[in-house]
Amino acid sequence: NPTVAPNPTKAPAKRGQVLVARAKAAKTSVALSWTKVNGAENYKIYGAKNNGKVKLLKAVSGTTRSWTQKKLKKGTTYKYYVAAFDSYGRITKSAVIYTNTTGGKKADIKKVTVNKKAFTLKKGKTATIKAKTIASKGTFKKYTSNIRYVSTNTSVATVSKKGVIKAKAKGKCYVYCYAQNGLYKKVKVTVK
């Protein structure tokens, strides 16, 4: 009898990948979406009212990149984060994002703008992304920095809390510039 080769064990996905979650609120629901994590076998969505304790709301497959929470209260602040898992455990998670359901006096971020969509830098040089947010009508309350920045490959380029890119090594990466509700602009960085 020929011997049957065992199934090769799937290698663990690369840890620390960037995962950006986004919330789009309606009156009684919040639609969540998120960026792809390579090797993810499932995603778990956690959330709560802003003053509540975050708990697991839903687990979805690794091919799913959106989910909507329904039956929420209008004009209320909710917080969420998304985590990606494989059979070895958690690969990565997003930062906590905050959004306000409509129908009340609370505003939400409706647009993010950046001064440049791409930067080409020599190793060791720096450049600054100037990102701005535009809120909807109403009272806007900040729960995080106005814009948060994250590099998809910190060995190529890092980015500071103020949007200063530093070129580290030859290659390409992206910087996500995202508002507290996860709305983002993606900036390409090329290091020569």
Predicted regions and their residues:
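Short solvent-exposed strand-capping/beta-turn motif centered on an Asx-Ser/Thr pair
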Residues: 37-39, 87, 134-136
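Extracellular low-complexity, O-glycosylation-prone stalks/linkers
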Residues: 40-57
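Predominantly extracellular/luminal cell-surface or secreted proteins
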Residues: 46-50, 85, 150-152
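Short S/T/G- and acidic-enriched coil/turn segments that sit immediately N-terminal to beta-strands
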Residues: 63-68
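Beta-strand-rich modules
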Residues: 69-90
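Extracytoplasmic soluble-region selector
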Residues: 104-192
